[in-house]
Amino acid sequence: TRFAIQILRDQIGQRVWPAHRLDRGTSGALLFALNSATANRLGQQFEKGSVDKRYWAIVRGFPADYGSIDHPLSRQRDDYEFQGKASSSEAQEALTRFCKLAEIELPLAVDRYPSSRYALLEVEPVTGRRHQIRRHLKHISHPIIGDATYGKGRHNRFFAEQLGCQRLLLACVELAFDHPVSGERLPIKAPVSGQFAAILARFGWPDTQ
């Protein structure tokens, strides 16, 4: 997010304020404001859960066609938080919904099975805990490909070495929020690109949201 702030600031020639953040390695829609007051109003929408967020993720295995992951997550402090601020490691409620968009089984023994299964999911994090999607998908044993922290090393290496994909296969493809002045509901879409789009094409999966 910090690098995106710098790039956008240089492009438009003025300071910008982020309304939210994406995990490092996650691509997709980022929302910025041109002043701090607007950024605060947008940030409040994220905190209240009134912003609709849709992500795409490529995971190991074949999850159910639809599902909800209702699993508490312990709080994780990040580098942006004030270090002197009191915090608790107590588990917080966390809910993620998903639906399966596509799947594929490759006749290759990447792990202990004679073939390897992968799926494309559309994911909606209802709550906004740190690393929520990545941690929840690991919890149901369908980790995201390219996730060095919560994923499976053998599958990550297979995608990197055999498919030329070295990135975390998680992207924010749509945000919908209320305009902080007019109140109009605004959807913003961010198509996947680069290595993510190349994997979709290679597997014959749809690339439109």
Task: Show which residues each predicted segment covers.
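RNA pseudouridine synthases
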Residues: 1-120, 140, 158-160, 169, ...
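Phosphate/ribose-recognition catalytic cores of enzymes acting on nucleotide-derived substrates
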Residues: 137-182
